[in-house]
Amino acid sequence: MRELRELEAAHPELIDSSSPTQRVGGYVGEQFAPVRHERRMYSLDNAMDLEELDAWIERVVEAFGRMVPVVCELKIDGSSIALTYEDGRLVRAATRGDGTTGEDVTANMRTVKDVPLRLREAALDGLRDAEAPVELRGEVYMPKSSFDALNVAAEANGKQAFANPRNAAAGSLRQKDPAITANRDLSTFIYAVADERALAVEGQWELLAWLREAGFHVNPDVALCETREAVHAFCKRAIERREDLPYEIDGVVVKVNAFSQQESMGYTARAPRWAIAFKFPPEEKTTLLRDITVQVGRTG
């Protein structure tokens, strides 16, 4: 994918609408009713090291002539979700799907304990129109302890174990029977709004505060950073703490804080220019090869 992006950057005439660089990952199945998102759910561009992260920071500096405040958040390794509330009540939940259309998983999301079925009264004043729908977004994940327990039970019953908590969360979310989802011990972190004009907040930091007030599960490991050094420190600390967290993370998301500045930077075909995902170095582990079986193939 990275080589394809570099090729298209050097030769724009080769870019086609069917290119993977122009699409958001995911799919829409036939098991659940399709739901069209209020606004497109974008992917994020990746920075594979601090040098690439600095290149993005330089683009931000070039856009505004100075370093502007950014919000650093842990990148949860789960499944994206969009929750729609009308008159303060949860009326719909949808997967990201292809970014434009997702799947209706409302019945299943209602079983996730930390998803408020109704917004707290104190937060309704933060809605510009309390009766109008507002779409809030985040990540559904499975805690490490729940994942381990699920796989122990699966193996005990002769069923195939899940490869990782992310797959387990996605599979649990798309169950036909909500009772199965309810028993999978899913959790969420909510961190975004589809249309910031729906709320009386001016930036990401203020949005996170409103989400907490409204009753959502918001990750406490966030930081408002005003310098490149502060961003680096957050990323390095996240790498150090990765194994100790009760849930899986695979990076840090850095976002320009002010919504007005986000709007000024805009989007590419697949990702916002005002955000970047700093990806952790791949984990290295040792595998012990206990035995091999040598066989002769049918062609000798």
List the predicted regions and their residue ranges.
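RNA/tRNA-interacting regions in translation and RNA-turnover enzymes
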Residues: M1-T299
